[in-house]
Amino acid sequence: EKFPAVNQKPQAAXL
């Protein structure tokens, strides 16, 4: 969530 690029990935949301 902190990183914009990560927000693109559903798995990262999870983190």
UniProtKB/Swiss-Prot annotation:
Domain of life assignment: Eukaryota
Sorted UniProt keywords: Blood coagulation cascade inhibiting toxin, Glycoprotein, Hemostasis impairing toxin, Secreted, Toxin
One GO cellular component term: extracellular region
Function according to Swiss-Prot or TrEMBL: Binds to thrombin and inhibits blood coagulant activity. Does not inhibit the serine protease activity of thrombin or platelet aggregation activity. May bind to the heparin recognition exosite.
Keyword hit for Oxidoreductase: no
The protein's name in its UniProt record: Thrombin inhibitor subunit 1
Tissue-level expression: Plasma.
GO MF entries: toxin activity
Places the protein is found: Secreted
SUBUNIT field: Heteromer of subunit I and subunit II.
Post-translational modification: Glycosylated.
